[in-house]
Amino acid sequence: MLDIKVIRENLDWAKEKLATRGIKPEQLDELVAIDAKRREAMVKCENLKAERNEVSKKIAAAKREKADASEAIANMREVGVKIKELDQEVDELQEKQEYILLRLPNFPADSDPIGPDESYNEEVRRWNEPTKFDYQPKAHWDLGTDLNILDWDAASKVSAARFVYYKGAGALLERAVYNFFLDENTSEGYTEVITPSLVNNDSMQGTGQFPKFTEDVYTIVDNDDPEVARNLTLIPTAEVPLVNYFRGDIIDGKNLPINVTALSPAFRSEAGSAGRDTRGLIRMHEFRKVEMVKVVKPEDSWKELENLTHNAEHLLQKLGLPYRVVALSTGDASFTSAKTYDLEVWMPAQDTYREISSCSNCTDFQARRAQIRYRDEDGKVKLTHTLNGSGLAVGRTVAAILENYQNEDGTVTVPEALRPYMHGMTKITPEVKWH
């Protein structure tokens, strides 16, 4: 959530910044007008409360002296009614103000490419050349089916479209990938955490998914009354429980930065993505992802964004997967992010790069929503900054391995970094079919 004081005192700047993220200036004018009314009502209310306190002392003194205080008492009853009305007005204006603030995205960093969509993203660097083949490479969904290690048909029968079964070497590969990620992340100083997969609305609001993106997730509904939600949502990413672990806390500044990592299932409704990536592992309703989260001091967050991105790149490099780093435009960056680097892995069958990780600096945006603070060396309490990044999306990594390490005979070579996690297996060959 943005700081209303920053908007109030820098309105033209705020309008210019948020215009690059699709926010109309009229929204900020409305917000500032509501804020002005709220502050005016607060001042009136505080003045009346101060007056009531002073008069109450005089009434008490008059009673001690057995003097008539009936007129003052009657006046104070009227003042009490006005105070109650003003308190209610302040609450209503505060609610309206918060309604708007909760739906405004983070201010973009000055270094962000300016543009309304992904076509304005800027490539920062590449690692390794795209994998070349002397033959037409197969798509990972064809490889997975031919090797009998991925089964979308069975998953569609049991669940719905955009679900998959991993079998045999496919299941072993998936497990190898996320164990490799966790081992590498912890070796880089991250503490591994196992999180809940269901979170409450306060948590979803704290990290910025609610109230703006309620259609993108799955919420648990009471079976006895389908209209009544249980206030629990299946997590779209481990970022939600990892960041909200610190919600409402005041952290000792000596303990910052805090680096945590977690493997979790991720559940996405994929609302609005009909017809896109209908085949394969790229866009699923349920998948596994290893997440990295940093809670840091504000002065360290830009350095930590580079560290976070390096941590994600390190995983792709150890797997030998070609990728590029892209700085997202103001119109393509996530709602909570001030700056995002996407890591895009090369997918030979599609002849293009596809996102496999997003590394974002959310500055104090999530910390303000979730009230994550720290106490500095002078004892002053301040908001932290939070960062998050995929380290990495597991299914997409499996897809990239299948496509980049495929052989002409239809087998897939296992990357050297994963062989210790796959019982020494060097090549994935077709699994026996059950039917």
From Swiss-Prot:
One Pfam family hit: Seryl_tRNA_N
UniProt enzyme class: ligase
Keyword Transport in annotation: no
Main subcellular location of this protein, as a coarse class: cytoplasm
EC number assigned by the record: 6.1.1.11
Alphabetically ordered keywords of this record: Aminoacyl-tRNA synthetase, ATP-binding, Cytoplasm, Ligase, Nucleotide-binding, Protein biosynthesis
UniProt: L-serine binding residues: T237, A238, E239, E291, S390
GO molecular function: ATP binding; catalytic activity, acting on a protein; serine-tRNA ligase activity; transferase activity
A GO BP entry: seryl-tRNA aminoacylation
Compartment list: Cytoplasm
Keyword Transmembrane helix on entry: no
CDD domains attached to this UniProt entry: SerRS_core (cd00770)
Annotated ATP binding sites: R268, S269, E270, E355, I356, S357, S358
Catalytic activity: tRNA(Ser) + L-serine + ATP = L-seryl-tRNA(Ser) + AMP + diphosphate + H(+); tRNA(Sec) + L-serine + ATP = L-seryl-tRNA(Sec) + AMP + diphosphate + H(+)
This protein's GO CC annotations: cytoplasm
Domain remarks in the Swiss-Prot or TrEMBL record: Consists of two distinct domains, a catalytic core and a N-terminal extension that is involved in tRNA binding.
Assembly mode: Homodimer. The tRNA molecule binds across the dimer.
PANTHER family referenced in this protein's UniProt entry, alphabetically: SERINE--TRNA LIGASE, SERYL-TRNA SYNTHETASE
Family statement drawn from the similarity comment of this UniProt entry: Belongs to the class-II aminoacyl-tRNA synthetase family. Type-1 seryl-tRNA synthetase subfamily.
Function: Catalyzes the attachment of serine to tRNA(Ser). Is also able to aminoacylate tRNA(Sec) with serine, to form the misacylated tRNA L-seryl-tRNA(Sec), which will be further converted into selenocysteinyl-tRNA(Sec).
Name listed for the protein in its UniProt record: Serine--tRNA ligase
Species per Swiss-Prot/TrEMBL record: Lactobacillus delbrueckii subsp. bulgaricus (strain ATCC 11842 / DSM 20081 / BCRC 10696 / JCM 1002 / NBRC 13953 / NCIMB 11778 / NCTC 12712 / WDCM 00102 / Lb 14)
Originating gene: serS
